[in-house]
Amino acid sequence: MMSATSLLVMNGPNLSRLGKREPEVYGSLTLDEINRGIAVAFPEVSFEFFQSEHEGALIEKLFEIEGRGGFSGVVLNAGALTHYSIALRDAISAVTMPVVEVHLSNVHKREEFRHKSVISAVCIGVIAGFGVESYHLGVRALLGRGNR
């Protein structure tokens, strides 16, 4: 049976290092463990998970899934690209699917350069600071859009 809702969960640079990189900031779970937890928490959703260290690969993936059709939205942790990637911002603007920006840490409690997001204005919302739950809240936000 085909799932009624398909979502892309997309992660940017350095998120492949979760579980090893600054666990006091990002937690001790690996990205694979986070992805498995998302899939278990939302069995009614068909997920595609994607991570790249490269800006262009994230942009290509957004365009690819829109071209394929059938996706209801994107949960995006763009990592450091959040703060400077105009190209990613433009790609988010170019797709018709809703995108939720998520961050494991509360970026506003961290270094000043992390306080500015160039992608927030083209996302439907931003969730930050709840650890792994940030991803779950992002999924819930996208699923709830059908009830509005």
Curated annotation (Swiss-Prot):
Designated name of the protein: 3-dehydroquinate dehydratase
Active-site residues, Swiss-Prot/TrEMBL: Y26, H103
Assembly: Homododecamer.
Family classification: Belongs to the type-II 3-dehydroquinase family.
Pfam annotation, one family: DHquinase_II
SUPFAM superfamilies: Type II 3-dehydroquinate dehydratase
GO annotation terms (biological process): amino acid biosynthetic process; aromatic amino acid family biosynthetic process; chorismate biosynthetic process; quinate catabolic process
InterPro entries given in the database record: DHquinase_II, DHquinase_II_CS, DHquinase_II_sf
Residues annotated as site: Transition state stabilizer: R21
Magnesium as UniProt keyword: no
Pathway: Metabolic intermediate biosynthesis; chorismate biosynthesis; chorismate from D-erythrose 4-phosphate and phosphoenolpyruvate: step 3/7
Enzyme class, spelled out: lyase
Record field: catalytic activity: 3-dehydroquinate = 3-dehydroshikimate + H2O
Keywords: Amino-acid biosynthesis, Aromatic amino acid biosynthesis, Lyase
EC numbers: 4.2.1.10
Organism, scientific name: Chlorobaculum tepidum (strain ATCC 49652 / DSM 12025 / NBRC 103806 / TLS) (Chlorobium tepidum)
Record function comment: Catalyzes a trans-dehydration via an enolate intermediate.
GO function term, MF aspect, one: 3-dehydroquinate dehydratase activity
Residues reported to bind substrate: N77, H83, D90, L104, S105, R114
